[in-house]
């Protein structure tokens, strides 16, 4: 999972201009709940979350609320972000106490297969992946 941001404020702060792009995120949250494949906190002006592929989010059997997870989770105060063209098998997104200015476009299973296929490490860096 990827977590970006800090705090619970809708006010502009040092978090911002982040790029979460073309990641392949899977098989996560096996020992936790209240999470997302991509999870954000606080206002992050100029942040773009795009062209990621996320699947296999599965809270552990002990989780108090097994439905409290999302592929993309904009939590407390998340504001001024663009979330677009992210592939996941279902449209399961969480928006909790968000601030203004978030733009959601074209996220879910209808996103191009090309985006899903191109996500993750580029060919020249794939040797870094644990086998």
Which role fits each region the language model picked out?
Residues 9, 27-30, 35, 40, ...:
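Residue-identity detector for threonine
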Residues 57-74, 91-96:
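Short flexible/disordered coil segments
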